[in-house]
């Protein structure tokens, strides 16, 4: 089980979300059988989605992040509910690339830098909020930071990391997101900048055994922070047979008739959890009748 924690500075001028998403990234790797670099990329996006989901207010709100930079991984999608429970998938789960010039997994090379980060927030209005920003890095954390600055005009700092073992399992994963609130004083900004300049990578801190509280404290440097709340988080798919039936109906009567006339069972697989739903021609026919 992962964990997400919210904090605020004593003067209320900045807040930070910090998360341990090791179990979430590990579950994604188990479901999608990703290679090392795509595990790292998807794990980072899931962590970002979890923290952005936790920022939503309504119980039924959700956020969807879609990243496509033209790299060999293709599109990456992560969706989170308002409690920070994400799910996601990557179009091409197995990508093999040399390590980058720092000797690290080449997430930028897998994601690509020629494309956009799309953010869709469903907060119960008639139409969801949709924002998009050009990919500036492909490393994902910098792209999240840029999204908040450009699309939401909110000064932010995002850090994400996933450490993958030689056997492709996940050793640790997590991240933090700092946002400045209106009227944030220069001293606070300066203290955060100083801390961020010297902080180790998220995965280094997690691998050293630092807790989420300790990582948040390091990220905020000399600033004192108060814990607001703490939640367990997990990889969570909300697919059901009823949702799949609804999706089948959107294919239209003509296509459903073709499936029925083929006389064979069909299999519908959920992209997020790989669960398979089977439908016989008779069940499809009943579904079509009920829809009329």
Over which residues does each language-model region extend?
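Cys/His-clustered metal-coordination modules, chiefly Zn-binding fingers
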Residues: 197-292
